[in-house]
Amino acid sequence: MASEGDKLMGGRFVGSTDPIMQMLSTSISTEQRLSEVDIQASIAYAKALEKAGILTKTELEKILSGLEKISEELSKGVIVVTQSDEDIQTANERRLKELIGDIAGKLHTGRSRNEQVVTDLKLFMKNSLSIISTHLLQLIKTLVERAAIEIDVILPGYTHLQKAQPIRWSQFLLSHAVALTRDSERLGEVKKRINVLPLGSGALAGNPLDIDREMLRSELEFASISLNSMDAISERDFVVEFLSVATLLLIHLSKMAEDLIIYSTSEFGFLTLSDAFSTGSSLMPQKKNPDSLELIRSKAGRVFGRLASILMVLKGLPSTYNKDLQEDKEAVIDVVDTLTAVLQVATGVISTLQISKENMEKALTPEMLATDLALYLVRKGMPFRQAHTASGKAVHLAETKGIAINNLTLEDLKSISPLFSSDVSQVFNFVNSVEQYTALGGTAKSSVTTQIEQLRELMKKQKEQA
């Protein structure tokens, strides 16, 4: 254990920290992922100190050499974390002192861990969100391109898990793609809030050494500089926003996963998952379980839990930095890892599943065309509410007779309304049914094709911003 004098806050305290307190306080196991970005921030700050006249050129070169050595050790995985390292910032400073001696202590001149930890977190999130955005756009592309290939496949659409109207399989795929484009847009908005530099804010009052914050911004490639030092070191709006966007994204993926789980059951038989994304049973040899989709579905709860915990941490804090904020890094890193894995698995599932066009078509039933029967009467001049009632009577008559609605005779239909004529037979055609929904957003082939074209264009724009 390091002596009290070696600790960052050494000098004020007598005796050693209680071991249980040390264990509770440490966050090093979580924060090792921030090691490299902490080095980046320290390199930028060292250059700013030299410009401000705090470091000589020789001292700067020595510090930069030490930081680069630590970066090299990190890349090789040989950096050693000690029991006394409370967090990654402490570990890097301790290692720098081991490499270059007491001159390492100059690096922290005018800099507080309060600003250091939030700068590191923002740098980590900037990098991570770019990767997440790339994976998300790949998933959207996979959905869109599959929709283009399988555009002629028709299956039942459901409301309340009851057969409702026939739709194109592509319409189903695109419904999820469109939702995910909104998530992609929201990730872009979060990036804007992350891209504000807090470094140079000190503990809360600012930096007293005439540090060039514009130089820091440029070195670390932030878009702008924080306006108020007290706000900069304590605000975690960007964390809440990211976790909120991640939660909504996982809810969308959970819905898609649930749909696909249902469609993959033997009761539906609409699709089969690849063996690469399925597992078996330890007891029942015949089982092929959609574990990939079930895990995607479960992760929504995990991510929402992270959001809820951070909101509860923040709701009771006074201004500026408090140790409670240590919880933010574990939440962010866990959600970054979860999203990165889930998006890749979802893309793998969508790209490899096999659909059964035959089973989808078998599931189409004439009763699903009852709305079309009402629309037939509307086109004959009947008000929709009356047409709806007439179609309902036709459904009831067919049920009474124990036959499908398309097997009602013309006389049966005329007994309901004289507007029925021989051309009513054209209503009972599933291709004709989907093709009438030509308005933008509908399930007609022309509309689905337009959706695909617009989504491809939107993806190009979002890729440029990723």
UniProtKB/Swiss-Prot annotation:
SUPFAM superfamilies: L-aspartase-like. One of its GO terms (molecular function) is catalytic activity. Gene3D superfamilies: Fumarase/aspartase (C-terminal domain), Fumarase/aspartase (Central domain), Fumarase/aspartase (N-terminal domain). PROSITE patterns: FUMARATE_LYASES (PS00163). Delta crystallin, the principal crystallin in embryonic lens, is found only in birds and reptiles. Despite possessing the necessary catalytic residues, this protein does not function as an enzymatically active argininosuccinate lyase. Belongs to the lyase 1 family. Argininosuccinate lyase subfamily. GO terms for biological process: arginine biosynthetic process via ornithine. Keywords: Eye lens protein. The gene is ASL1. The keyword Cell division does not apply. Homotetramer. It comes from the Eukaryota. The keyword Transferase does not apply. Eye lens. This is Delta-1 crystallin. One of its GO terms (cellular component) is cytosol. NCBIfam families: argH.
